[in-house]
Amino acid sequence: KLTWLDKTFNSVSIIIFICLMIPQSFVLPVEKMKKSDYNQKSYWYYPWGKSGTHKGVDIFGKKGTNVVSPVRGFTFATGNGKHSGKYVIVLGPKLRFHYFAHLNSINTNVGNWKSLGEKTGTIGDSGNAIGKPAHLHYSIVSWLPHFWRIDNDPQGYRKMFFLNPIEFLNDCFKN
């Protein structure tokens, strides 16, 4: 007879397996963005302010430009942080969190389904980006660790969770 713990473990395992098997389609997270709107070397740039290492990419654009969901998924969180400013987190396929920070406006609510390319907010300069050129800070964080990504870079152990968004952006420009 299966115990409550066995049933829970089996259920969670099935959910994780299904989430990992869902194919991921990806579109650019900023409307009408160009490859020149982001720096190819900005991911894991060190040193980078209070965080030590830049764990994403900054995509520069005109304040108010639409930020869209690059994947299908659920709005996991929204808020306004001291450093991030206005932010949105979308949970997409492969149990990956897509993090959008320094927004000027938020156009979604927690629990909302986001379709591919659906507006989530607008480029801004909120949080510690006040007084700097308007941009979107975009990160992709895996819920499951990718141990093979750990290296000797500063905070390199954290690479098991932070994926390089520039690889995804560059793939969009190849098509």
Spans of features found by a protein language model:
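Surface-exposed, glycine-biased beta-strand/turn segments
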Residues: 2-86, 115-116, 125, 162-175
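Aromatic side chains
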Residues: 38, 43, 99-100, 138
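Glycine-centered loop/turn positions within well-structured domains
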Residues: 57, 65, 98, 106, ...
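A generic structural motif
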Residues: 60, 91-93, 141
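Zn2+-dependent peptidoglycan hydrolase active-site motif and core
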Residues: 69-107, 133-137
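Conserved, short, structured surface segments that act as functional micro-motifs
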Residues: 113-175
